[in-house]
Amino acid sequence: MQRQLIEGRAALIVIDIQAGAFVEKDERSIPHMPDYAERMALAKTAIDGARASGIPVIFIQEVHRPDLVDFGRELDGDEDVHCLEDNPETAIAVEQTGFTPRDYLIKKRRYSAFFGTDFEILLRGLRVDTLLLCGGLTDVCVHYTFVDGHQSDYFCRVIEDCVAGSSIEAHEAALRAMEYLQTGARRSLDEVMTAMKAHAP
């Protein structure tokens, strides 16, 4: 059954668009598909649109302690040490997103924004029904946040122009997996902008 793009109240969830995504490097601690930075920068259009429509914007930031004590099993796969508290590249990408200290910010230690955070308390306080997801990685933090949102009975949408994965193949597979859970989950930026404008006060 396909629902409306926005059911009830929406929030834009900006996942892990952090300063390091916009630093040119030969090697990265986490693999990125081509055009990763460009896709992250495009999220600013969605952020501006949400603000103009009165839709709350919630930034998610992955951050780890410098002694690595909270990584758990996260380093057992393809990822190397990343997002340390004392690294400037871990900060939210202020210039590219327009983030301000007045914005909602959830810091997480795991892939899902729901796991071990007060994200759901914030969503309940805002009376949110629909999560509009952008950021990265499509196949990791976006996917797992989507799944936990789905299992918590939120309507979940992923803005496919504004997410990027560890590879093109992983990105596409994650988008298909999310669409499997909720028909109509994959949405273009243009579609989301139109829906947000329709919900403006």
Model-derived features with residue positions:
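Active-site-adjacent betaalpha module
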Residues: 1-11, 48-53, 77-201
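Acidic-leg catalytic submotif of subtilisin-like serine proteases
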Residues: 11-21
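Short beta-strand segments at enzyme active-site cores
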Residues: 15, 55-62
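Short glycine-enriched loops at secondary-structure junctions
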Residues: 16-18, 63-64, 88, 111-112
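Short acidic/His/Gly/Ser-rich catalytic and metal-binding motifs that mark active-site loops
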Residues: 20-25, 67-69
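Short glycine-enriched, charge-decorated loop/helix-capping segments at active-site entrances
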Residues: 27-36, 76-82
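A short, N-terminal amphipathic alpha-helix
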Residues: 38-56
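Acidic, proline/glycine-rich short linear motifs
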Residues: 65-75
